[in-house]
Regions:
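Short Lys/Arg-enriched alpha/beta "domain-start" segment
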Residues: 1-52, 155-161, 165
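A short glycine-rich, hydrophobically flanked beta-strand micro-motif that places a catalytic Asp/Glu
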Residues: 19, 72-78, 148, 180-184, ...
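An anion-binding catalytic pocket shared by soluble metabolic enzymes
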Residues: 23-40, 157-240, 257-260, 338-361
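Contiguous alpha-helical scaffold segments within structured protein domains
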Residues: 32-34, 39-44, 95-127, 133-134, ...
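Non-catalytic accessory segments adjacent to catalytic cores
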Residues: 49-158, 162-163, 258, 389
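A residue-level signal for conserved active-site and pocket-lining positions in enzyme catalytic cores
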Residues: 76, 143, 200, 247, ...
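A glycine-rich phosphate-binding loop feature that marks nucleotide/adenosyl-phosphate handling sites
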Residues: 153-154, 185-191, 249-251, 266-273, ...
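Conserved hydrophobic core element of enzyme catalytic domains
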Residues: 280-391
C-alpha cells in the first residue's frame, strides 16, 4: 500500500471532528463538514416511493440545491425501530478519499492506549440473558416464530472525555476491511463502528446486498481457524438460521426488482474475530426505487430482528430490558440521484462525553444454547472492546 495514501486516511480519521460524518467503504469513502439541515423524519414507510418520508427527503434535497449545494447527500443513521426519529442530515460539504488497501493499512496506524474504566455494567447480567435465550429458543420451536435476535449491552464510564477521532483511527487499524463509520448525533454524542454487513448498495439501477447470519469464533492457529470456518459452513443450526434470512430477503426484493440473483448456498467471510455465513444478493431496481426505499424495505432484516418480523419484534420488546435506539439500525448515505450505501449498525458503540454503550446480538433458533449465545455476543463485543483497549 502507498504510504502517502495510508497517511491520508490516518490523518482523515485522527483529525475527525465530533460533528463530522465519516464513512469508509469499498464503494465510496468520504467525510463531511458542516450541517446544512438535520432530518429527523421517522423512516417508517420509507420503502414507499410516494410516501411521506420519501416526499420529505426529496424536498430536503431540493432545498439544499436551491441554497447552492450542487450535489447534496443525506447521511447518518436510522434506528432499529423506524417509528422513532431518524438521525440524518445534509452536510454543507463532503469530500471523498481513497480507501486503504485492505490487508496492509493497519501497520500505518498507531497503537491503542487502554481507557481507565470507572464503572462497567452488563445489561442484562449473564444469568438474565441466558434466561432470555432459553425462553426465546423454546418459542422458536413453535409455529409462531422461527427465529428471534436478542441483544445485550455493556455500559462503560471512563475517567475522561473520549476522543472519537482517535478511536476511529484505531478502529480502521484493527478492522481495515469493514464498513467503518462515525455518525455525529444531535445530543453531542457519536455513533461509531466497524460493520461487516452491507444491507443495500445502489448505483444506477443495480443494487447489491450481503446479508450475514450464522457465525463462529476465529482461532489463532491457521489450521484450527479453517476448521472453525468449515464447521460453521456445515452447521445445520447456522445454515437454518442463515436460510431464514436469505429467503425472507428474496421474497421482499423480488417484487421490486428485475433479475434478482443469489447463490443457493452461503459463502464464508471473516472479520478479525469471527467467521460469518454470507450470501451475495444482486439485482436491478425498478425505475421508481432509490437506495433508501430499498434499504427501508429490507430493514430490519431477519438477521437483526428475526422471522416472521412482527412476531420477532414483539418478542424482542417483551424480553429485552432496554430500547435498542440506533443499535441494530442502519448507517449510510444516499444522494438525490437515487444512489447510496447502507450498512447494518452492528459492531458499534455510542459515545457521549465520558460514557460508552456497546451492543451485540445473536440469532436464536431452537438449537441455540444460552451459554453459547452469551459467548457469541461476547466475541462480537470484543470488536469494540479491543478498540477501547479493553478485553
Amino acid at each position: 500500500m502507498d504510504t502517502s495514501l495510508a497517511e491520508e486516511v490516518q490523518h482523515t480519521a485522527a483529525t475527525l471532528q465530533s460533528d463530522s460524518f465519516f464513512f469508509m467503504s469499498p464503494y465510496r469513502s468520504f467525510t463531511t463538514s458542516g450541517c446544512f439541515a438535520r432530518f429527523s423524519e421517522p423512516a417508517v414507510g420509507g420503502d414507499d416511493p410516494a410516501g411521506q418520508f420519501q416526499q420529505k427527503l426529496a424536498q430536503a434535497f431540493l432545498n439544499a440545491k436551491t441554497n447552492g449545494i450542487a450535489h447534496p447527500v443525506m447521511v447518518g443513521a436510522i434506528p432499529f425501530d423506524t417509528r422513532k426519529p431518524s438521525s440524518l442530515f445534509i452536510p454543507q460539504r463532503w469530500q471523498t478519499f481513497s480507501r486503504p488497501a485492505r490487508q496492509q493499512s493497519a501497520r500505518y496506524f498507531s497503537g491503542s492506549q487502554a481507557l481507565k474504566v470507572e464503572q462497567r455494567t452488563e445489561i442484562p447480567p449473564q444469568p438474565v440473558f441466558e434466561e432470555m435465550v432459553a425462553r426465546a429458543a423454546s418459542l422458536t420451536a413453535t409455529p409462531q416464530v422461527n427465529k428471534v435476535v436478542l441483544s445485550r449491552l455493556i455500559d462503560i464510564a471512563t475517567d475522561k472525555h473520549i476522543d472519537s477521532g482517535a478511536l476511529m483511527e484505531r478502529l480502521i487499524a484493527q478492522n481495515p476491511a469493514s464498513f467503518n463509520f462515525h455518525v455525529p448525533l444531535e445530543d453531542g454524542g457519536v455513533l461509531l463502528g466497524a460493520s461487516p454487513e452491507l444491507l443495500l448498495r445502489k448505483e444506477g439501477a443495480h443494487f447489491s446486498s450481503l446479508p450475514l447470519a450464522g457465525s463462529a469464533r476465529r482461532q489463532p492457529d491457521d489450521v484450527l481457524d479453517r476448521e472453525a470456518g468449515n464447521k460453521l459452513l456445515a452447521s445445520e443450526k447456522d445454515r437454518h438460521e442463515h436460510d431464514l434470512v436469505t429467503q425472507a430477503m428474496k421474497a421482499i426484493l423480488a417484487p421490486r426488482s428485475h433479475h434478482l440473483s443469489m447463490p443457493s448456498s452461503p459463502q464464508l467471510i471473516t472479520t478479525p474475530t469471527l467467521w460469518h455465513l454470507a450470501t451475495p444478493v444482486e439485482g436491478d431496481a425498478r425505475d421508481n426505487e432509490n437506495a433508501l426505499t430499498l434499504a427501508c424495505l429490507l430493514h430490519p432484516t431477519p438477521a437483526l430482528s428475526g422471522f416472521p418480523h412482527e412476531a420477532a419484534k414483539e418478542l424482542i420488546a417483551e424480553l429485552e430490558p432496554f430500547d435498542r435506539e440506533l443499535f441494530g439500525g442502519i448507517v449510510g448515505w444516499c444522494d438525490s440521484e437515487g444512489n447510496g450505501e447502507w450498512v447494518v449498525t452492528i459492531r458499534c458503540a455510542r459515545l457521549h462525553k465520558n460514557t460508552v454503550r456497546l451492543f451485540a446480538g445473536a440469532g436464536i433458533v431452537p438449537a441455540s444454547s444460552p451459554v453459547g449465545e452469551w459467548r457469541e455476543t461476547g466475541v462480537k463485543l470484543s470488536t469494540m472492546l479491543n478498540v477501547f483497549g479493553l478485553h
